[in-house]
Amino acid sequence: MYIKTLMAAAVVSVLAVSGARAELVTQSLPKPDMVGGKTLMQSLQERKSVREFGRLAVNDQTLADMLWAAVGVNRQDGKRTIPTALNSQDLTVYVLKFDGVWQYDARGHKLIQVSDKDLRPLLGTQDYAKDAALDLVYVSTSDVATNGAMHAGSAYQNVGLYCADKGLNN
């Protein structure tokens, strides 16, 4: 866990340096698809980690649904799909893809490009990790280290269940 935290911190540091862009690039996401899907128990049964990924890009609807599952706003009062200690909502999700690094704006349900560089190779040393179409990096601004880890774990689990529901490897 410590190594992964250091790697994520390194990626975020690179983002801070490389993120200075002349113009702000945003990408609106489609509304989350709330229809259909497997039962929770089926998704739990099928949830697993794998070491094989296709090189196909993830379409916008799938990415929108995945990010909404991670930390999306699911109530009128602005609360999220994951619980956060004292409703701190201190977790930010970054999407690393071939076309750069994008920050997920949960309130606006959109992506904001923070770098146009493909930083995915910085995340993993295993060969299989390089084949993933995208990586999600969870960054917490919580002053309490355990809260950030707890929030990231909740978001990660939601994404895992979403992927199981859709038959996606994660």
Where are the model-predicted features located?
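Short small-residue beta-strand/loop micro-motif enriched in glycine and branched aliphatics
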Residues: L6, E52-F53, V144-A145
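Bacterial N-terminal signal peptides
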Residues: A8-A16
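Short alpha-helical scaffold segments that flank and stabilize functional sites
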Residues: S13, G72-V73, K166
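Small-aliphatic-rich amphipathic alpha-helix that forms the alpha element of a beta-alpha
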Residues: R47, M66, V93, L134-N170
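Bacterial N-terminal signal peptides that target proteins for export
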Residues: M1-M7
